[in-house]
Amino acid sequence: MVHKIIFSHLFVFISFLSFSSVNNESRFSIITIGPYEDELYSAFGHSGIRYYNKSTGEDVFYNYGIFDFDQPNFYLNFLNGKLLYKVGKYSYPSAERFYRNQDRYIKEQILNLNPPDQILLYNYLEQNIKPENANYLYNYVYDNCATKIRDILEEVIGDKLSYAKYDEVISFRKLMDKYLDNNMWGDLGIDICLGPEIDSNIPYESKMFLPDYLFESLQSAKIGDTVDLVSETNEYIPSQNKSYKNIFSPNLIFFLLFIVVLFISFRQIKYDISFHKFDFLIFLLTGSVGLLLSYLWLFTDHLSTSNFNLFWAFPLNLIFSFLLITNFSRRLLNFYFILYS
C-alpha cells in the first residue's frame, strides 16, 4: 500500500516536471458556440475545451460532439437511442473558422486552474482521445458535449468546485423550447416522441446539458470560497444573426388540415357520402406515429416511456386504416370508431 502511495505521488511529480516548463504559458478555456438553426442537432449550441500553449504554439480544441454517419448501423443506433459519439482533438483556429462561417457566436471562458489541476485536466483529456476511450453513449440531456465538460471539471477540481444556485424552476422540455422557435418541426418531433420524463422540474446541475446554461454556471462558479473558476471571458459576436422561420410550419399545416376535415365532414353530413380514402390516410398516419412511439417506449433507451400521445396516435389505427378500404364488417369498424373517439 505504501509503495502505491509513493508511486502515485512520484507519477504526479514527474508529470508536473514535464509540464512545469510550459505551465506559465498555457491555459485551458471552455468554448461555448451559439445555436445553428439549419440542423436540429446544432439548434442548442455546442461546447468544447480549448488548450493553448503560447510557448509551443499548440492551440487545440477537444470536441465531445463528434458523430460519424458512416459508423455501422448508424440510423438503427440513432432510432434505438444507442448512438455513439466520440471526443476528438484538432486545431482550434480551424474550429473557430468553421463556427464563424456559420455566423455563430463564440464565447471563451479562460479557467483559473492551478498547475496540478491543469496537469490533471491535460492528462484526462489526452487519455480520453485515445481510440479505446474516445467513444461514449450519447444521450440528449444526460450525456452530451456540455454535460461531459461539467463532469470533467467536477472530477478534476473535486469538491472545491461550487456553483451559484438560481431559483428558476423549469423542465427539460421548456428549456428545449427556448431554442426551437425557428425550428418548429423539430420542436413538434420532440414534443411527440419524448415522454413525460422531460416534463419534470430538474435540479440546477441538470440544466447544464445546454451549452448556454453551462456557460452561465461556470461564470459564477467558485473554486473554494473565494477563487473564481473563470478568470477572463472573451466573446466573438457575428455582425448579423441570421434568423428565419419556415412558412410551412406545423401550425399552418394543421390549420389547413382542419379546414379540409371540416369541409369533408360538412359534405358527408349534407350529402350522406363517405370519404374512406381520407379516413384511410388519417388512420394510416396516426397509426404509423403510434407504432413508432410504441417502439421508442418499449425497445429503446430514449426518454420516451409513458408517452401519452399514444392516446391519439394509437397503433391499431394502422390495421384499421386498411380495413376501411375493404369490405370488412361495418359494425366492427363503427364500434372501433366509437371506442377510439
Could you say what each language-model-derived stretch is?
Residues 21-25, 233:
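Membrane-proximal intrinsically disordered regions of secretory-pathway and membrane-system proteins
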Residues 15-17:
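N-terminal signal peptide c-region/cleavage motif recognized by signal peptidases
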Residues 24-103:
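Glycine-rich catalytic cores of cysteine/serine-nucleophile enzymes that process amide/ester linkages
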Residues 1-9:
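Bacterial N-terminal signal peptides that target proteins for export
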Residues 68-143, 147-157:
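A cross-kingdom signal targeting lumenal/periplasmic-facing segments of multi-pass membrane
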Residues 127-317, 328-341:
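Activation targets extended, charge/polar-rich intrinsically disordered C-terminal tails
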Residues 27, 46, 59, 108-110, ...:
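Extracellular structured ligand-interaction cores
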